[in-house]
A protein has these predicted regions:
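Terminal, regulation- and interaction-focused segments at domain boundaries
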Residues: 1-14
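A short, structured loop/turn motif at beta-sheet edges
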Residues: 13-14, 59-65, 89-98
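Structured surface interface patches that mediate subunit assembly and partner/cofactor docking
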Residues: 25-29, 35, 39, 43-46, ...
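Glycine-rich portal/gate segments that line the openings of hydrophobic small-molecule binding cavities
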Residues: 35-75
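Beta-strand/loop substructures that line and gate deep hydrophobic ligand-binding cavities in soluble
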Residues: 75-127, 136-138
């Protein structure tokens, strides 16, 4: 049973095509993370909401006109990757472009559940096309079910949104991390993600020249590295250890570290750049629990974290998390 929906964007077909195919633009309305090999036979993997990733291959591509891809969900016995087909057709009309999406190969029950999703995300696409920004996706705020990998994906969505506010004007601003400017903190975050990724077998990112690095937005650099690392960690699983540090590091601890890197540094960067941080209490409470499993006297002693700051247990979970990591004035 097919699902069929058409929306209008006040954009030309080429701009609309970029919104539905390029990872940087997909992250603004549809995905938390996206891997795209845009060629016929090329694969894609889109983390739609934390803990739930769609995957498949591209079967038709006409830039500015049409894209067809197989569709399914990782880990789903009922609709695995490749089990259905999504066709998106773009037509130039007065004032913009119509975007028609047809999802074939679904049962009636699957069509009903996907209709809810497509209405949600195509609505976000329209808002993005009209207003230029659609805001954070409430569906990505708290994973269901929640686990250390899904919470890391939710925290990644938060830091990516903050990173879009990093500009040349605020790149040199100081951050709550001592001795780190915004630019230096972004580099630190990238290095932390890459070190865990390398331990998982992800190729180490090439070291670009300063000029080349400056030309790539901070959000793109972090998002690309994080997508590869999180996909590799999800594929590997959280049992056992990874080759990181003397004697190895428990894979579960690596996941915990990513949670802290994403969410705590999102607060650091938001504070430094004057942005408002939006975090669901259930997410910050869960990550606080991971922090209590991960941050020890030894990690505080080696300089990774400052001593915890006293804060009332009645305080909200995000200030308690920040205080536990040693952040001053976490409120």
């Amino acid at each position: 049973m097919p699902f069929d929906m058409t929306v209008f964007l006040p954009l030309d077909p080429d701009a609309a095509f970029r919104l539905i195919t390029e990872p940087e633009r997909l992250r603004r309305w549809k995905t938390v993370a996206a891997r795209v090999e845009l060629r016929v036979g090329g694969e894609y993997r889109w983390t739609i909401v934390p803990g739930h990733s769609a995957a498949g291959t591209f079967t038709e591509i006409e830039p500015g006109k049409r894209v067809v891809l197989t569709w399914g969900w990782e880990g789903s016995p009922d609709l695995p990757p490749g089990a259905s087909t999504v066709s998106i057709t773009l037509d130039a009309v007065d004032g913009g472009t119509t975007v028609r999406l047809v999802h074939d190969g679904l049962t009636a029950e699957q069509a009903a559940s996907h209709a809810q999703g497509w209405h949600h995300f195509l609505g976000r696409l329209v808002t993005l096309g009209v207003e230029g920004d659609v805001g954070p996706d409430e569906w990505a705020a708290v994973p269901d079910p929640i686990d250390p990998l899904a919470s890391a994906e939710a925290a990644l969505a938060i830091v990516q949104r903050v990173l879009r506010g990093v500009t040349a004007a605020n790149a040199g601003a100081p951050t709550p991390c001592e001795d780190f400017t915004v630019t230096e903190l972004v580099a630190h975050l990238l290095d932390s993600i890459a070190r865990i990724g390398t331990a998982l077998g992800v190729p180490e990112p090439a070291a670009p020249s300063s000029a080349a690095a400056a030309s790539v937005p901070a959000e793109v650099r972090i998002a690309d590295a994080a997508q590869k690392t999180l996909e590799a960690l999800r594929l590997r699983g959280l049992a056992g250890t990874v080759d990181l540090g003397p004697g190895g590091l428990p894979a579960s601890t690596a996941a915990n570290i990513l949670n802290l890197e994403f969410l705590v540094h999102a607060w650091d960067l938001a504070t430094a750049t004057g942005q408002q941080l939006e975090v669901a209490p259930a997410l910050s409470d869960y990550i606080l629990g991971l922090a209590r499993q991960t941050i020890t006297d030894a990690t505080r002693g080696n300089g990774s974290f400052h001593p915890a700051i006293d804060v009332a247990e009645s305080a909200a979970s995000l200030p308690r998390l920040l205080a536990f990591t040693g952040r001053r004035n976490p409120s």
